[in-house]
Design a protein with these regions (language model features):
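Active-site pre-lysine segment of PLP-dependent enzymes
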Residues: 161-171, 184-210, 214-247, 263
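Conserved PLP-binding catalytic core of the aspartate aminotransferase-like
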Residues: 155-157, 302-303, 312-346, 362
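N-terminal small-domain helix-loop-helix segment of the aminotransferase-like
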Residues: 27-110, 117
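N-terminal export signals
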Residues: 1-29
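Conserved PLP-anchoring active-site segment centered on the Schiff-base-forming lysine
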Residues: 121-142
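PLP-dependent aminotransferase class I/II
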Residues: 62, 237-321
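Short acidic capping loops at alpha-helix termini that bridge into adjacent secondary structure
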Residues: 101-105, 127-128, 207, 214, ...
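PLP-dependent enzyme catalytic core of the Aspartate aminotransferase-like
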Residues: 342-346, 351, 355-401
Length: 401
């Protein structure tokens, strides 16, 4: 049998056993970024399928980013610290866009790297993680992998984070993960509520860090919303994470960032992967950040398609949570797994299951209007097979308008 590098080193495969906290600690400050994965988690996707499962921008990067990518190939042989634009240029572009100084910004390979680093920085066997249920899973998965306790606080009946219960759970915690707008429920809390929450946690548990994930902030239309960046600048151990994977259409390029006080950002930098950006992604990101008109157009496009898709479900009699993102969370009264499988057989890919609401709710990402019209027909067909058409509706009215 051929000798592989893995067998030569005697290293177990990632699926063979979980990495223990002792193993991680023994590696010192190495960038421990492994995540458990299996082939089943990433099935082959048919080219013809409409992909409404991962909250991606269906149009991809804007024209400025595409032009920058083409020009950047001349520097593809350079490390991203030496290319032009460089990683330093990207930090400066983010700082200008957000209204902070470059020292208030740190970069990540998508915001996922930063979420995992936050758990490593602030969590421990005696300092638990607080998160909502359901919410984005990466922080709790990293905590479980490292043997850090997790306290999951159920969302309320409208899918909003229960800030009162989360504040109570935050006492003696290492880290609170606050996703606003929340994935998968798509709901948000206004600026005042977030500010009051931060002030309370800082008062009652001053050593607890607060991570406010704003991955979907570019899609928000609620006038009561405001970014938490000012809170991150005001308070130590409070920070905001964002990504260019959503509105900027750069999910495959893995560009994310965090904003906070310089000392807080230094903590992330100690855990960061060396060269956690590539020179092509840096060039595209800088160009995108300098093209705010493209993001405004993307927000308008998503708002129109989101409203259309909301009507598809409400016309069928289903409750849709108040979406402030590029996806919907819908009470379909049946399992997300079964709905996903029925849609997939018809060429529509929708979101994964989100415990503890996986028996009743599904997440559907927003594509183009054309994609949502086609998906609407399939959704009506799939749900119609499991629930009667609302009284007074004809079979024609079940088709999206």
């Amino acid at each position: 049998m051929p000798v592989s590098r893995r067998s030569f080193l005697g290293v177990p495969s990632p699926g063979a056993a979980a990495y223990s906290p002792a193993f991680v600690a023994a590696r010192g400050r190495e960038a421990f970024t492994a995540e458990p994965n299996s082939p089943a988690a990433a099935p082959t996707v048919p080219d013809a399928a409409i992909k409404l499962s991962s909250n991606e921008n269906p149009l991809g990067p804007g024209p400025a980013a595409m032009d920058a990518l083409t020009r950047a190939f001349v520097d593809a042989g350079r490390y991203p610290t030496n290319a032009r634009p460089s990683m330093g240029d990207l930090r400066a572009a983010i700082a200008r866009r957000v209204g902070v100084q470059p020292e208030n910004v740190t970069l990540g390979a998508g915001s996922g790297e930063l979420l995992r680093s936050a758990v490593r920085l602030y969590g421990s066997s005696s300092r638990h993680l607080v998160t909502a249920a359901p919410s984005f899973e990466q922080p709790e998965r990293m905590a479980e992998q490292l043997g850090i306790g997790v306290r999951r606080v159920p969302v309320d009946k409208d899918g909003r984070l229960d800030l009162e219960a989360m504040a109570q759970a935050a006492r003696w915690a290492g880290l609170v993960f606050l996703c606003n707008p929340n994935n998968p429920t798509s709901t948000l809390h206004p600026a005042r509520a977030v500010a009051e929450f931060v002030a309370r946690v800082r008062r009652e548990s001053p050593d607890t860090a607060i991570l406010i994930d704003e991955a979907y902030h570019d899609y928000v239309t609620d006038p009561g919303y405001a970014t938490a960046v000012p809170l991150a600048l005001e308070h130590p151990n409070v920070f905001v994470t964002r990504t260019l994977s959503k509105a900027y259409g750069m999910a495959g390029m893995r560009v994310g960032y965090a904003v906070g006080q310089p000392r807080t950002m230094d903590g992330f930098n100690r855990w960061a992967i060396t060269f956690n950006q590539n020179s092509l992604a840096v060039a595209a990101a800088v160009a995108s950040l300098e093209d705010p008109a493209h993001i405004e157009a993307e927000r308008a496009r998503n708002t129109e398609a989101r409203a259309f898709t909301t009507r598809v479900f409400t016309d069928l009699g289903y409750k849709v949570m108040d979406s402030q993102a590029n996806f919907l969370f819908v009470d379909i009264g049946r399992s997300a797994k079964g709905f996903k499988e029925d849609c997939a057989r018809r060429g529509i890919l929708v979101g994964r299951e989100f415990p503890p609401l996986e028996k009743t709710h599904t997440r559907v990402s927003i594509g183009t209007i054309d994609e949502m019209q086609k998906a609407g027909v399939v959704i009506a067909e799939v749900l119609g097979a499991h629930r009667p058409v609302p009284a007074g509706s004809s079979s024609d009215s079940r088709r999206p308008r």
